[in-house]
């Protein structure tokens, strides 16, 4: 098969590292450019021994941007929120496919971005051109866009868990409550006392409640799924003593009586062509070990008929389906390749 020339901007963060791990085994990728100020001029194999393909490729810095852009067809941006906006604008305006793993182009309203991320968006005109790149929900839009905004890790799990039932009108979209346990890599490579081993071990720490940054993203997309102006969700994230992985519970009020069998059948039908979404049957519940180092999402459905509630348990790897793995799935869709290429051995 023909290959595409790829660059990674921000290749030394956790998402960037995961992108490298996955892309070196992707048969359609010719990795041409990786950036990291920390590792500048070092080879890929000197930083990640045993990496295999592209081991002699050297980390570069962004000062070489103008020289390198002609060598690239597709660019992953794996920078912290706010740091990659100008690079997205630069590459997009030069006809490159841009896949941005940050939150910079997820929110349609620049005022929401300013409120939750404390930054004024310098390229707000691009927000209308960006596609929210959740593969199982928006594959057609992904296939025709050059600016692809990757969903956050929590919203990925929440939206994929709820979508089959929201689209049917079975859940009141204003009743949704979420509690999630997450590993520490979700915070990035931040120098923060709260992320030290001795602070994480033997501990669970709720954080960013009640106004986590992923809330407007969830609310925006839930409103789109049910075709209403706005919804409000309650979201409690909890930092767990784990490197990676998310296990979450979603609860919503049923808007009509449904059976357990109907709920499972609806989910199976909704995701019948989704290779990475796995619905667990018969009361089996997801565990983190099912999803680590994969692009899979596992979830179980529990209809609480007497309480008129639907409870969903879901598990993903925040660096896999929550970040780098899903970004490669999106690349595959955009290029007309099988979604699973490079993601399933």
Swiss-Prot record:
- Give GO terms for biological process: L-arginine biosynthetic process
User: EC?
Assistant: 1.2.1.38
Q: Transmembrane residues, as ranges?
A: none
Q: Which reaction does it catalyse?
A: N-acetyl-L-glutamate 5-semialdehyde + phosphate + NADP(+) = N-acetyl-L-glutamyl 5-phosphate + NADPH + H(+)
* Catalytic site positions: 153
Pathway of this protein?
A: Amino-acid biosynthesis; L-arginine biosynthesis; N(2)-acetyl-L-ornithine from L-glutamate: step 3/4
Protein name in the entry: N-acetyl-gamma-glutamyl-phosphate reductase
